Amino acid sequence: MATFFAMAYIISVNSNITSKSGGNCVCPADDPDHCNSNTDYLMCVQEINRDMVTATAAISALGTFFMGLLANLPVAIAPGMGLNAYFAYTVVGYHGQGMIPYSIALTAVFVEGWVFLGLTLLGIRQWLARALPASIKLATGVGIGLYLTLIGLSYSAGIGLVAGAQDTPMELAGCTDALRQEGMCPSADKMRSPTMWVGIFCGGVLTACLMLYRVKGAVIIGILLVSIISWPRPTAVTYFPHTPLGDDMFDFFKQVVTFHPIKRTLLAMEWDLAGHGAEFGLAFITFLYVDILDTTGTLYSMAKFAGTIDERTQDFEGSAMAYMVDAITISIGALLGTPPVAAFVESGAGISEGGRTGLTSCVTGFCFFIAVFFAPIFASIPPWATGCTLVLVGALMCKAAAEINWRYYGDAVPAFLTIAIMPFTYSIAYGLIAGILSYMLLNMIVWVLEVGSRGRLVPPNKHEKDPWTWRIAGGFFPPWLQRLFRGKKDFWREDQSQLTEDEWRDSEPRLGEVVVDESINSQEPVQEKAEHPKA
């Protein structure tokens, strides 16, 4: 239950963000304000939002339950934060103004899931995750955190604190929608939006205080409080104004408990890529790369938290099945209309309460299943209730910046470019491209100068550079494939013996080696080592 309450916010946040793309609703190309005042289009978008509530809860329930049943891990999965924003605001674009239509974007997600599955089976997934420099991997999470923060501060899916400007790319906003002029706020009306202040104090300050005192479900408490304040109709902060759109939303909200079938986003994929090949490829590669890093990093950290990491291979039991469940869930989610799913760090809430097995995930999945029938509630959560949630999630993601190697410019500059370009271009892909290319360029120049000068031109602090290698401890191929190559008939089963003959030989001290017992400096008595059993 702790895991569910820690991440239940994803149902409303993901539906709010994804529906801003417009889904498969059609906005006329000549519409002057991108259909922001088109009632028929906005009612269609509201239907997309309701579909997304059902789809998000359903795919989270399915993926999380099978993560526990098949992989026996206490990890929950749901549509990933960051990837859903990239999907909605860059790939599809606000109200469909992006690179490719919604239906083709779903096709990219569907294909990415199956490719991810193939990479997992062949062991390439692990290699790709480790082949990227550590600074770029850490910077990716930080950049996505700032990206989410910017979305949470904007109008479309946030509190409306910032907006576009004429003389600068962005400026302070905070006026009501009725007072906005061409997307900008007049100077006399800034910071006067009541919904913004409700979102800041009840959804931001209160939630941060609850998190400060480790209150379980702090995020969902803040979201629900702002929503409850915004539900009464005759108020300045109501989410249900007396308009045709507001009346339709209020009528659905009054049902409270009902099953809303997925109508518009189910099986909405389009396989005709004519005219969209390059954009499709960029979206596909970005989804795949971010999903590999996100899922690998989260599963690794949760497994380490649960104490199941093998220090030699840096892998954990059930890893292959966990990645396969995640990959298949990505493709199933595309059939329902959702962005790619990923493992959630909020799973740590359940682990900290004692959850160490898949039973924790099974219970969390069942809770998401129950949430499917509360679609009217989750579909009626306003964007200013979730805006500060995005800011807080961004803050949590940015703590990885402390682990970046800022001492060596060959690591620091590419990491900074990755972080900065993601929010400034509203694109995860462009940030990754800038970071990877700059890393290759800088370190290639250093290598050429060092080789050409025969070791005389070397950066003074090159010894502080993060180590990098394409080799993987434990071998390139996954354990199940190695067992198959060895001729093991039940290759899908883990080896029973803890140490193989080769591993034991590697663990024995060799001639000329000095073995230092680290327990000398500890307070614990030294235990005698067990002798190796004779053959």
Q: Could you describe each region identified by the protein language model?
A:
Residues 93-225, 362-496:
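Membrane-embedded alpha-helical modules
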Residues 75-77, 218, 295, 338, ...:
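Conformational gate/switch positions in structured elements
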Residues 478-535:
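Intrinsically disordered, low-complexity cytosolic terminal tails
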Residues 1-10, 31-39, 54, 59-60, ...:
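Helix-loop-helix junctions within the multi-pass membrane cores of secondary transporters/permeases
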Residues 202, 281-285, 317, 321-328, ...:
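Alpha-helical membrane-protein architecture signal
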Residues 19, 72-76, 124-125, 159, ...:
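Transmembrane helix-loop junctions in multipass membrane proteins, especially transporters and channels
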Residues 64-75, 209-214, 286-294, 327-336, ...:
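Transmembrane alpha-helix interface/packing and boundary motifs in multi-pass membrane proteins
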Residues 1-50, 185-186, 223-320:
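Helix-loop-helix hairpins and the membrane-proximal interhelical loops
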